[in-house]
């Protein structure tokens, strides 16, 4: 099968591309490299540099490949950047997603959309949060990703496509950048590998649902094989505090360095954990990598850089 992966030079997208290549599929990666890296692009993938907000450039990259499946992961993924420049956030995450929807429609290809989980539901959501809880985004990023969901599901209904929305938990693992709006796992790991004090925002009690990137990539393959439309949380359903993440990474590093405390960023949530019951029951997906194991593996990767 021919699979288009937008954002495939990025952290999660490159692992999704790997997963489909390992299955024997042909993969085209479209990425503008604004945050992704050519080093992340798998050797056997075809690469086209294009901006998803430029419909003409996107079509020129995609049409000769004629994908049978589209995995859309290209995004403006920084909460802070979305607050600083909500117009750009909207262009990438809303207009860009619309352009990808149209490219998929022209080829009759179902689209699997990488949505946000935690930034969508808000601090007052029940935990673990089910998919049918009313989204209450707390940032322009959360709002734009929710708008992207609406286009993906509307195109599924309009054009009878088996489009899938995957609301991802906090993904961590090898290849995650520690620069810009990075996850704490990447930031902590890089600082510990250099023997530096990692920055701990807030008091460390804020919680997230940490999912290893290999499990996230497997969810895309599972959704593709199911060949049915749907909306699913992709998560562990387990809340882990930032302080616990730091503790596990310090154990992996054999380090005792104390963190540098810093205030929470604007728009940052106190807690987020998603309910994965639906995807487990309907598609048979469940995470395989426990947090402690995944953090050890992730730190080992950063230690080699």
Question: What do the PLM-derived regions correspond to, one by one?
Answer:
Residues 82, 132-136, 161-177, 187-211, ...:
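A conserved pocket-lining segment of Rossmann-fold NAD(P)-dependent short-chain dehydrogenase/reductase
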Residues 1-171, 214:
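N-terminal Rossmann-like NAD(P)+-binding domain of SDR-like oxidoreductases, especially those catalyzing
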